[in-house]
Amino acid sequence: MKLNKVHNIDFLNNDLPDKCANLIIADPPYYKTKGDFDFIWKTFEDYLLDVEKWCLECKRLLSDNGTLFWYGGSKNIAYAQIIFDKHFYLLNNLTWNKGSFMGLEESEILRSFAPCTERILMYSNETYNLTQCIFMIRDYIRAEIIKAKGKIVLKQVNEALGTATNGGGVASACLSLDKTEPTMLTKEMYQKLQSWCKPYLTKEYEELRKEYEELRRPFKNKFNLQEVLNFSNEQAKTGAKYDHDTVKPETLTRALILTCSRENDLVIVPFSGSGTECAMSAKEKRNFIGYEITEKHAKMSQERANKILKEPTLF
């Protein structure tokens, strides 16, 4: 699996292993909206058949704690959502507000309101959630207590923690098997359990916390974004530069990548187009693998990313 490469092949013909993608950013053809690639299907039903194929391939590739972004036009995104909702868990139906659109908001020529938005569906794998991360930590602690004490008596655990002396309280919240959402122990409480369970429960709290964080789906909202994403459409400036009809803004793409992935994560780009997603992945120290059926766009995407990859760093 060669990283940081744009393949000039159909995304459906990839040879990637299952669950390899930490983040998928897919900007597919919207169907009869803009660009030659939007008009290759005879009917909308034919287009939706391909959407289903793309969806299933994304499902195969997305890791258990990964995130998928799926772009679409405001008129047709509902049809894609019906398909994706069958296979993923919908986190957000995001609206990308592009701002002023060719001054049409001041004109009545369209006989309707000016189109200034696109949609981005945000999905996770419905089979994996935060609770499962806590279950793994809880099960480790339970196993170590059993090694040390032979069995788990919640009252004794509470006494060791210096909390309630009955069978409920903190011990029940953190360790009981019948809790649908167990609570994470604080560092102070965990260290008390370590002293009580010597020579077992040897993992340090910071090690457990790091494991917990790495198991969670990445989401750090450093840009304070909400469901409406206000990013100007840079296409007027970048479209001609990259010779593509649907160039996505670098600012928006960077925000999605930084919010929903970690450094060295793998970003899969099923439709690399002008190369924005690949280039911004490289810029933010993520690995990427892109796919593009048009040769000139595949070459352009690779060159755009390579320019960033070859930039000297301070360290």
Where are these regions (language model features)?
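Core catalytic lobe of class I
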Residues: M1-Y291, K296-A298
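Positively charged, low-complexity nucleic-acid-binding target-recognition regions
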Residues: K307-F315
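Conserved SAM-binding loop
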Residues: S301-Q302
